[in-house]
Amino acid sequence: MAFVLSLLMALVLVSYGPGGSLGCYLSRKLMLDARENLRLLDRMNRLSPHSCLQDRKDFGLPQEMVEGDQLQKDQAFSVLYEMLQQSFNVFHTERSSAAWNTTLLEQLCTGLQQQLDHLDTCRGPVMGEKDSELGKMDPIVTVKKYFQGIHDYLQEKGYSDCAWEIVRVEMMRALTSSTTLQKRLTKTGGDLNSP
């Protein structure tokens, strides 16, 4: 009995370690969470986007980078994680609480956090030594600049209802792109530890 228990413990440790893959499999649940987050964002619509046309802005979504094949697997994972983290940061603020239906906002933040938690199981093994060697990766800097532009826009517009509506629509674009990136990673086997 002790031998079987030891063997099971060793299997678990190997599977979740840098050489294993169980902790880094991009599951179907991650995709379902992504779809649910998009559905919630759609339901958060309070204003007609047409009534806010004067507030439109091109935030410069790095769509080609996110949806194209420019990124290596570890970079793609990092970009996906950063996009979800920054999306969470946009909606997890005191100012966003005043703009949206609290229940839908909480559900969206919970859904984004669940996606991040799932990806966190991969973060160490995937990022590991490569991240420290690369320092600040250009794709991550691009994503951060994109989201900084969104934060700056909200502040510039005084967090108005129209500004939030424009950002909601933009976040739907961003999360749709991140879902495309998730699909691409899943097609590569979803196992982000594989070579």
UniProtKB/Swiss-Prot annotation:
Q: List the disulfide bonds.
A: 24-122, 52-162
Keyword Signal listed? yes
Localization in the cell: Secreted
Query: Does the record bear DNA-binding in its keywords?
Result: no
Explain what the record says happens when changing residue 136 to N: In IFN-tau6A, IFN-tau6B and IFN-tau6C
Tissue specificity: Constitutively and exclusively expressed in the mononuclear cells of the extraembryonic trophectoderm.
UniProt-listed Gene3D superfamilies: 1.20.1250.10
What do the Gene Ontology cellular component annotations say? extracellular space
Which residues does UniProt assign to the signal peptide?
A: 1-23
Q: Which SMART domains match?
A: IFabd
Its primary localisation, in coarse terms, equals: secreted
Superkingdom of this protein's organism? Eukaryota
Q: Which family does it belong to?
A: Belongs to the alpha/beta interferon family. IFN-alphaII subfamily.
- What more does the record tell us? IFN-tau genes are intronless. They evolved from IFN-omega genes in the ruminantia suborder and have continued to duplicate independently in different lineages of the ruminantia. They code for proteins very similar in sequence but with different biological potency and pattern of expression.
The name this protein goes by in its record? Interferon tau-6
Record organism:
Ovis aries (Sheep)
Give the source lineage, highest ranks first: Eukaryota, Metazoa, Chordata, Craniata, Vertebrata
